[in-house]
Amino acid sequence: MANSPQSKKRARQAEARAAVNKARRSRIRTFLRKVEEAIASGDPAAAAAALKTAQPEMARGVTKGVLHKNTVARKMSRLAHRVKVLSVPAAA
């Protein structure tokens, strides 16, 4: 348990930051889920729109230190590829 005033304050700050980070991560997951649902529905326009709204949220997660840069880059790349494949008609 924190004993000194400084360590008590640090514990409070860490708890507050953890709550903010948890909320931000949850928000990002919600945007990703919307993209996944749009891809699953098969609607290229909806998928592209959902991806367009999700990308800034994911990038914000990187700048705020919630997610790692490479993780977000990988997720964005994979989602963009899936949306692109959805919008291009399948070659027979």
Swiss-Prot record:
Region (Disordered): 1-23
Keyword RNA-binding belongs to the record: yes
Cellular component GO terms held in the UniProt record: small ribosomal subunit
Recorded coiled-coil stretches: none
Record-level GO BP terms: translation
Keyword RNA-binding: yes
Domain of life: Bacteria
GO molecular function: small ribosomal subunit rRNA binding; structural constituent of ribosome
Keywords of this entry: Ribonucleoprotein, Ribosomal protein, RNA-binding, rRNA-binding
Family: Belongs to the bacterial ribosomal protein bS20 family.
Function: Binds directly to 16S ribosomal RNA.
The protein, known as: Small ribosomal subunit protein bS20
Originating organism: Cereibacter sphaeroides (strain ATCC 17025 / ATH 2.4.3) (Rhodobacter sphaeroides)
